[in-house]
Amino acid sequence: MGKITFYEDRGFQGRCYECSSDCPNLQTYFSRCNSIRVDSGCWMLYERPNYQGYQYFLRRGDYPDYQQWMGFSDSIRSCRSIPYTSSHRIRLYERDDYRGLVSELTEDCSCIHDRFRLNEIYSMHVLEGSWVLYEMPNYRGRQYLLRPGDYRRYHDWGAMDAKVGSLRRVMDLY
């Protein structure tokens, strides 16, 4: 199991809260989050309670201010620990409900367009492991956690559109 510590102020100062499991509502523990230390595991942070809003993927390391995790503000309201798996496999579909051209990945892909000539993915089936989807190539832009399961439409993974730029396997070792 992973371990993450949230700090209200930059540079690991101020009130802190240590967490080692999923938490749908962090508001009772701190009012703002300006720095984070991930001691172990991989985590997805959410700007709103109940795993809603912008998502931020963090792995082991120190994040002395919210810009270090590409945050837009000091609002972190929920978090998920992402379990480690040794194998990863995901199927991508060019249309919703698993229709159209299908492509499969087992490794990180820094540019979906270069690899598959697709700019949009409308549905996915995560067969093994957890993945982070990025809206732009080279692991940039909005992030979405994809855990094993079915994603019939882009709304199912929390996106506002079908734009997919890159995909990365969630692994504790980078």
Curated annotation (Swiss-Prot):
Matching PROSITE patterns: CRYSTALLIN_BETA_GAMMA
Domain Beta/gamma crystallin 'Greek key' intervals: 2-40, 41-83, 88-128, 129-171
Keywords for this protein: Eye lens protein, Repeat
Keyword match Zinc-finger: no
Organism superkingdom: Eukaryota
InterPro entries, per the entry: Beta/Gamma-Crystallin, Beta/gamma_crystallin, G_crystallin-like
GO biological process, one term: lens development in camera-type eye
Chain spans, region Connecting peptide: 84-87
MF annotations from Gene Ontology: structural constituent of eye lens
Extra remark: There are six different gamma crystallins identified in rat lens.
Family: Belongs to the beta/gamma-crystallin family.
Domain notes: Has a two-domain beta-structure, folded into four very similar Greek key motifs.
Known role: Crystallins are the dominant structural components of the vertebrate eye lens.
Protein name, per record: Gamma-crystallin A
